[in-house]
Design a protein with these regions (language model features):
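A short, acidic, amphipathic alpha-helical segment used as a generic capping/interface helix at domain edges
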Residues: 160-173
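Long, low-complexity, intrinsically disordered segments
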Residues: 233-243
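Glycine-rich phosphate-binding loops at beta-strand->alpha-helix junctions
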Residues: 12, 171-203
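Glycine-rich phosphate-binding loop and adjoining helix at the ATP-binding site
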Residues: 25, 29-42, 46-54, 59-108, ...
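Short, low-complexity intrinsically disordered segments enriched in A/P/G/S/L with frequent Arg
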Residues: 221-231, 235
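Short glycine-rich, Thr/Ser-proximal phosphate-binding strand/loop in the N-terminal lobe
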Residues: 2-39, 124-154, 225
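Short beta-strand scaffold segments in enzyme catalytic cores
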Residues: 13-17, 59, 101, 118-123
Length: 243
């Protein structure tokens, strides 16, 4: 089964399909709607063959459907029929969860995605729990306001790096993971990593997208496992968005 993986971000939409060696991308931005995203993907992947679609979505997801419009994109994502738009079966998960799934090794792993915002996912013994930690209160705003793109632009790289260390330290102390992965496009700006952290490969978002359609054993539902190496269960934790 050939899979088309779509990684939707605040600045770019990146795609890769089974059997392809190079990803393709186009610009997104604060006005991009779900319909525009689909149109862009269909055009860019027009010469690719695929049977199913995985979408990494920058916001909370429940039962493979967005439950809130993304903070850094346009409107029209909630209730959008991706299956009808692509004409194929579609699974949607939080974008950080998709990259976390591709980064997971074992035990209890915390994934933090440093990009337009702050993506976050906890995986415990293969069970994937997407989270919205970026919207939790921090100092005078939220975690995302300090370590997301807005924080980087406002603070500058030196102060931003210090905030990343502080946020990582607080979340690690609260969640006590065995493994901490820092991913997202801005992770490369870090000169060094917080203690106990490893740098994630952003290509793992595509790996996670492929795993979403891996065949499940008979004892579990098709949505219940990501493959023989990782027992995954996509169970998004839905939080209301903070204004």
């Amino acid at each position: 089964m050939d899979v088309l993986v779509i990684d939707v971000g605040g600045t770019h939409v990146k795609i890769l399909a089974t059997g392809q060696t190079e990803k393709r991308e186009f610009d997104s931005g604060p006005k991009m709607t779900a319909q525009q995203m689909v149109a862009g993907v269909r055009k860019l992947a027009g010469d690719w063959s695929y049977h199913v679609v995985s979408i990494g979505y920058p916001g909370p997801v429940l039962h493979h459907r967005p439950v809130a419009d993304p903070k850094n994109l346009g409107p029209g994502w909630m209730g959008f029929d991706f299956r009808k738009a692509f004409g194929r079966p579609v699974k949607v998960t939080n974008d950080a969860a998709m990259q976390a799934l591709g980064s997971y090794k074992k035990g209890k792993m915390l994934f933090l995605g440093l990009g337009t915002g702050l993506g976050s996912t906890l995986i415990i013994d293969g069970i994937v729990e997407p989270m919205e930690l970026g919207h939790l209160p921090y100092k005078k705003a939220t975690y995302e306001d300090y370590v997301g793109e807005r924080g980087l632009e406002r603070l500058g790289k030196k102060k931003w790096r210090k905030e990343v260390f502080d946020v990582a330290d607080r979340l690690v102390a609260a969640l006590e993971p065995d493994d901490i992965v820092l991913g997202g496009g801005n992770a490369k700006i870090l000169k060094e990593l917080p203690p106990g952290c490893r740098l994630g490969d952003n290509e793992n978002a595509f790996k996670g997208g492929f795993l979403m359609w891996a065949e499940a054993p008979r004892s579990e539902s098709p949505a219940g496992r990501a493959g023989p190496a990782v027992a995954t269960k996509l169970r998004p934790t839905v939080r209301s968005k903070r204004s």
